[in-house]
């Protein structure tokens, strides 16, 4: 060996990184000191790390190290937010709502929320377990090890190089970011309303509306799931060519920030061996597979919080009655540091939770206020649950994990196993609003709101209207497993963010509490397309060879980019604009529809890179498809059918508006010309389309008039098509925005380019599959002491 190589190896050992050039060492080989951390990292193509360790602490160490290598700026920024320091470093105003987020995070710190989560619940399932605690500590140590040996000023990512807000992590930092994720769809979506809640003044409203407008409330609460969605298939033996279980995972998540996924394969020999993806900053696989079972998640329609209407004490708007006795709210003033000085806000808490407002609907008046109970606020079970899911051998064992831990904060589960059995379940954390409680405790003016939306407003003046406890629930206040919708099938289950009702069209799930979602109602265009794709594939009528699914056929279906809205109404729309070639836009302009009509007549009803006219149809649909036909509960996949009320003037107005907003001539621009994503100076063509248009492969990239759609905001992110065959799992994966946010990383844009051409990375799970990777790089990270 050359002396230069020996010097390089010595330097690597000094930094705690050993590069293996030949035989792969065991994770603990050459461990510097008993009780330290050591992990073996094998980087495969596209930077995907396969991490092996002897225990969960060292596994977390490896995860923290590689995630810091690839995304240290994202993790550091999320920690700043969770610690109530966002306003200080990023300003008090702007698109991040830094002031609101900082104030809320500071309140959570003052309340010792994360510390109390680590103490575990007073009653219910004990969590987090020792393995998870070890893994979190290890993650922190691995992140800090990378930062210490690299140095803030030598980071290669310009987004945080040399920034004062990049610092070593503590264990509590990581638990705070986890808590932020738990409450995302509950109190996290109501931050504005919680921060804005102040006692009434003489100038405020005297009373709240007696009959709240359900549509107005829905609009005000629209942020509860903004920016996230998903599709998933669980295919059983009757749906696959080989009779094995198969899963398609297709979460739709933001392309920037802490909610990006990160691909990895984690292994503690004999205890845990799971490949898939997790959100950046999380130490455990959240969507993925082991040798015999695979799973994905889709965003559930169930509600995560309930309102309590408070009857206030006359003359004292910060006191309320419970069973005829007054109780005082607890006022807490929180002061945060911003770039321009300190800012103070006062929060008001009740026995139910914080007071919140939705102006014009849920106002704080001299007589009435509203408090919320977020049932995820005490959810410390998530990482325990995902860890145990990864150890399940089949979908029945997986369901047992879900039943015991009830940890999923706001998602369904769709799974399949090597025996060919598929599972759907909404095992998410849901407030315990049973039919009996709703009937007895939702005041009459709020009953229509609950029936239409599942938003429950309970009578806060009665203690018997509290959420109570189910005997089989993991913790009090949530629906137990016996009240949740579950379906096992040997053909298929699916979900695309509608409710549980049609997870299996052959066996609809009905009779569940309204708070979980609606039943026997029209499904979204994306749900209908997802079901139609499966049914056509099983019948062999989709234009692809044969019948049934292989992973190759599943990939083709996933990226077929059908636009179901266009399939249903394009011909009628073309006929209409040919009969009436001019229309008045909503701004009063008279628009010639001739060119648009020609483009739509040639549109292939897909969102492929070479599809022309897709953007025009997408903008038209922003005005809403209007069916004259009715929904048939016995035919939910195909109704409402495409029968238009062509006399409705809004149809032609919507088309005129689409023409006005079109980035250029609809007859000359393809999806690949105008749907792009930036990677430095490079603009990568992006296929896919809006979910509202009935596109399965969702890509949301806002229109910039005169330019096109230059930046993806959210959509298809991690995609997995995996088959659980007799020789182990096989299939395809991709992470659309790539592993790293660092523009100087080799893994900054490689998978985005791969996605653009509908390519894939082959799943590598077995030792033989990993060893065969042509780009494999092996190294070990270690640290003395813990």
UniProtKB/Swiss-Prot annotation:
Residues annotated as transmembrane: none
Proregion residues excised on maturation: 23-34, 215-229
Pfam families per record: Penicil_amidase
Entry keyword Secreted: yes
Signal peptide stretch: 1-22
Comp. bias regions, Basic and acidic residues: 672-684
GO molecular function: hydrolase activity, acting on carbon-nitrogen (but not peptide) bonds, in linear amides
Annotated stretches, region: Possible recognition-sequence of an AAC processing enzyme: 220-239
Protein's GO biological process: antibiotic biosynthetic process
GO cellular component: extracellular region
SUPFAM superfamilies in UniProt: N-terminal nucleophile aminohydrolases (Ntn hydrolases) (SSF56235)
Region (Substrate-binding): 35-130
Documented EC number(s): 3.5.1.-
Localization per record: Secreted
Family statement drawn from the similarity comment of this UniProt entry: Belongs to the peptidase S45 family.
UniProt subunit comment: Heterodimer of a small subunit and a large subunit processed from the same precursor.
Listed name of the protein: Aculeacin-A acylase
